[in-house]
């Protein structure tokens, strides 16, 4: 029996470290840990594909949590069937469950359905919160970088603060702040 491990995070900004540490503590060699940095809904999971090719009958695949393996209930059922057909057991460390035996497979299926429902509920709440925030005028995304040089160039051409703000799609108060900062800098040079 060989131990393999699988870890996945949903975005490239998240870290696999905690999952990998847990797999190593459970006895998986670093060379037998396969990882993916992609959404569970993504079908491009090279680490999982490689793991599926490497495992053989009698091997055990460890995964830190149930929701780290499959995209949804159907995917989890498909993956557990594939591993089962190969004679490979899948054990979920934190959840304390395994696909060994019929009862284990049933528990995995039920918990996968619960996890999928929870993901959908979280997505709904997130979207509702976004919609509410948009109605309140809250903007999302990175703050725009204001081009101070454009403000100063337009001002030197005789353009007024209101027109500068309109042309550059910034607040008039921002234009005044930039002009005020620039005049302070010029005064300090004297």
UniProtKB/Swiss-Prot annotation:
Protein's UniProt keywords contain Cell division: no
Keyword DNA-binding in record: yes
Pfam families: HTH_7, Resolvase
SMART domains: Resolvase
Active site (UniProt): 10 (o-(5'-phospho-dna)-serine intermediate)
Biological process, per Gene Ontology: DNA integration
Residue ranges of the annotated DNA-binding region, renumbered to this chain: 161-180
Resolvase/invertase-type recombinase catalytic domain ranges (all copies): 2-137
PROSITE patterns: RECOMBINASES_1, RECOMBINASES_2, RECOMBINASES_3
GO molecular function: DNA binding; DNA strand exchange activity
UniProt keywords, alphabetically: DNA integration, DNA recombination, DNA-binding, Plasmid
Domain of life, per lineage: Bacteria
Matches recorded under PANTHER family: DNA-INVERTASE FROM LAMBDOID PROPHAGE, RESOLVASE HOMOLOG YNEB
Family: Belongs to the site-specific recombinase resolvase family.
Role played: Site-specific recombination protein.
Protein name: R46 site-specific recombinase
Species this protein is from: Escherichia coli
